[in-house]
């Protein structure tokens, strides 16, 4: 049985996150509302274009970056230019598929480094990656270094929103998801070997160091992974279903590998099922 006190509800944590942003800036809501309203209108246009059969890959990247800036940061001066890019991109419904950029990513329509990870890892798993010309993954070359990887993850582990104006959940989750795929998916490991022009190697040391960090990050009481927050009354770790699903899914990946505390993962999932 999982101790209910360990299971912070999504509504409660969202309220506390909002309060932390307001503690930092009393005008937070006044800044957030008009930007979010503009984003909602542009998102409706994007959804309409996609429903009409247009892929809109570049627009989607702009939209996701704007969503992150508005909901996970208070960097308001950065939001307007990204919304402008989104609005302009929506005028072209026949956008070409995104190809690998000069930095090695498939994130041509992203500015933030970590936002390039997801589209790149996805593209590397498409059939074209096995045959088309490829460039070095220079933008993520640092992810081959175990010390850099662990240091970056550790800096993302706890968000102190009142001090920094940044909720690091999205970046931490993106990093964990990308690394779990890069390191644990046989398909990607084989691709890095068969396509040496990518200039990316997953070393045994990287796998060992990352795996050890992953198990240390797991809450042994619940079996879950999730972001942590520094509030005035102490730190709170969220038992996050999305984090946990991706870690379990990519680690196992048809390999038969065993997740530590899997019985706790099941018990916690059953305990929070009404919150999902």
Segments and roles (model prediction):
Residues 2, 13, 17, 70, ...:
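Weak global preference for isoleucine
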Residues 30-58, 74-111, 142-173, 207-237, ...:
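Glycine- and aromatic-rich loop/turn segments at beta-sheet edges
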Residues 138-144, 202:
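Alpha-helical scaffold repeats of the Armadillo/HEAT/TPR superfamily
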Residues 201-207:
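Glycine-rich, flexible loop segments associated with nucleotide phosphate handling
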